[in-house]
Amino acid sequence: MTIDNKIRHIVKEFKAYVPGKSKEEIARNYNINPDEIIKLGSNENPWGSSPKIKEEILKELPNIHQYPEPVNPILMEELSKFTNIPKENIVVGGDGADEIIDTMMRILIDKDDEVIIPIPTFTQYRISAKIYGANIKYAKFDKEKDFKLDVDSVLNNITDKTKIIFLCTPNNPTGNIIDKKDIEKIINSTDALVMIDHAYIEYSKEEYDLTEFALKYDNVLILRTFSKVFGLAGQRIGYGITSKKIVDYMMRVKPIFSITRLSQICAITALRDKEFFEKSKNDGIKSMEILYNGLKEFKELKVYPSEANYLLVEVKNGMSSGEFCVELLKRGVIVRDCKSFEGLDGEYVRVAIGTFEEDRRFLEILKEIVN
């Protein structure tokens, strides 16, 4: 007898998610000083988080033996002010925005229900859908049009069994945004939940705010996170903006104490530090411009415009994306090989923003490999 006989078949078919490489791993494998490694593989904030957070964490440490409040009223008030959305339309989750995704799966998905996922995009949508037994219908971001969303490929997949449509904008890993009118067209074509992932929206240079859709329609949920511009990826906290009806359903089934006391303190402090937020956002956009302009100089690479904190780069010098990444690793630079992104055929890597000095060093190192 063996426990293997009791494991769900879908779980047996899964391979464990492989995250971006850490500085510590590369330091060990390539005998490089960790302080000299340039990490551009995980879409993190290279400037860290608000300097005010450390002091607030120290104040909270005496209380960590106590359970956190499931709904922290101070955090909800700060989020409401930051988003200009009533707090009754906001739900906060631990584990970044992933908990929000998982909670909606619990609420909506029965076995053999359908979800629509335009690809290439964030892998977590597919993983969650499969775990809950959904059938995935793939739409597409059109490579021939710089990965613009093929709206018809979404609309043509909508059926009575469609429960969730995922729209990542700016899209990961391509960096482009989806036209607002196209999103509203999709919303008006279905009663399924349209989940709009806005993890990187603060880096967009365009006037692009879709929160009105979450108040106008009862089948829209907008995902936001503290992991990027706020620099709190290690605290794992995200939130959703949606109808009061959906908030009510989510509060019935989401984990009760998933947002730790320290995560709540970090989020509150980050929201209050407006100066850091603006500098982090503006420096991130400037870093993107440095990388984009620098990468365009290499004729052996094709770089795509981006409204996020990363760039999609096609390797066209005869190397595979894996070989390209290894050559960078040998020189202490981490970027993301995009082979794991379904629907992205070819040799692509994703390069996230660094500090201005890291950007400069990366572009210099790149000359050794590409040229």
Swiss-Prot record:
Names of required cofactors: pyridoxal 5'-phosphate
What sections of the protein cross the membrane? none
Reactions this protein catalyses: L-histidinol phosphate + 2-oxoglutarate = 3-(imidazol-4-yl)-2-oxopropyl phosphate + L-glutamate
Give the UniProt keywords, A-Z.
Amino-acid biosynthesis, Aminotransferase, Histidine biosynthesis, Pyridoxal phosphate, Transferase
Q: Which residues carry this modification: N6-(pyridoxal phosphate)lysine?
A: 228
- One GO BP annotation here? L-histidine biosynthetic process
Q: What is its EC number?
A: 2.6.1.9
SUPFAM superfamilies on file: PLP-dependent transferases (SSF53383)
Q: What class of enzyme is it?
A: transferase
Xref: HAMAP family? HisC_aminotrans_2
Q: What is this protein called?
A: Histidinol-phosphate aminotransferase
Give the organism the record lists: Methanococcus aeolicus (strain ATCC BAA-1280 / DSM 17508 / OCM 812 / Nankai-3)
